[in-house]
Amino acid sequence: MAVFVFILTFFFMEGVAWFTHKYVMHGLLWNLHEDHHTHTNPGFFERNDAFFLIFAVPGILCTVLGSSLGFLALFAIGLGITAYGFCYFLVHDVFIHQRFKWLRKTDNVYFRAIRRAHKKHHKHLSKEDGECFGMLLVPYKYLKAEIEASRK
């Protein structure tokens, strides 16, 4: 049962990330997210990095409370949130934005589609008119474009 809860939580987090990105990061908390689009911060860290902590808190709380209370489902939820956060970090910060110079030379169609969709998202420098707010699920048109490009 705990494995099912973990997997369900992991995939549910894609919806949470999409919703939060579209309505919170590009809404009420745009002041934290804006420098991620405009690259106005000259240093390594961005105000946008605060979202790492904001998203980490529920994962940590669920993991610690689930573990200390012996509530396995809550522990699994915490691990699912944390696993999604780790994947988000690898895909978004490492693979897409190359904040760390790992995973640079992949030729995988799916990963290229993720990169293409995110690039489209970053074409919008304001909080309005955005698109592609998710991370791991990309609109089919980007996957299709990469499949067609790989056949050439």
Predicted regions: what they are:
Residues 1-20:
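N-terminal signal-anchor transmembrane alpha helix
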